């Protein structure tokens, strides 16, 4: 069975972000907190967002989602206040269509 042609596939977007936290947080707890925030804000329809934490180094990271859900994911990311019991302030750095461009433009120092 053949896959979908590129013109029919869902487009992905990559959101670069920075987390200011009182203590170090790990990738798993951040991913869980973001999923829980999406679920509480938008209900079960967040499953169609294609949400995935691509990279996180303790302070900066990249979240992948489908283009149609970009606004919802950015809202959920912005409204997060706690991750695993640690108070956080998430800052969105920018959005890109590829991981490579996202890293080069927003995450390199």
Swiss-Prot record:
Is Cytoplasm one of the keywords UniProt gives this record? yes
Which biological process, per GO, is one annotated for this protein? Answer: tRNA 5'-leader removal
Q: Which gene encodes it?
A: rnp2
What job does this protein perform? Part of ribonuclease P, a protein complex that generates mature tRNA molecules by cleaving their 5'-ends.
Q: Which UniProt keywords apply?
A: Cytoplasm, Endonuclease, Hydrolase, Nuclease, tRNA processing
- Main EC class the enzyme belongs to: hydrolase
What is the catalytic activity of this protein? Endonucleolytic cleavage of RNA, removing 5'-extranucleotides from tRNA precursor
Listed under GO cellular component are: cytoplasm; ribonuclease P complex
**Native species:** Archaeoglobus fulgidus (strain ATCC 49558 / DSM 4304 / JCM 9628 / NBRC 100126 / VC-16)
Please name the PANTHER family in this protein's record. RIBONUCLEASE P PROTEIN SUBUNIT P14 (PTHR15441), RIBONUCLEASE P_MRP PROTEIN SUBUNIT POP5 (PTHR15441:SF2)
- Quote the protein name from its UniProt record: Ribonuclease P protein component 2
